[in-house]
Amino acid sequence: MEQAMEIAEIVDYAKPCMDAERALKDAHNAVLEGKMELAMTKAMDALVSVRLMQGALRHMKEQNG
């Protein structure tokens, strides 16, 4: 008799973390170049990525106790 294969859900927190780091770096560089609209957009991108990371970490915590 075949056994059902258990499928593990992988939650990636590292990608949003790296995306946030990149967005913050881009925001900083935009400020240095005087591109304030771009800086504000990149800052918002960083916030979105941090929120995704927070959700992934919360999910991991719930799964691991």
What do the PLM-derived regions correspond to, one by one?
Residues E2-A14:
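Short, charge/polar-rich alpha-helical segments
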Residues M1-M5, M60-G65:
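Short intrinsically disordered terminal tails
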Residues D12-A23:
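Short amphipathic alpha-helical heptad-repeat segments
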Residues R22-N64:
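Short, charge-rich amphipathic interface segments used for partner binding and complex assembly
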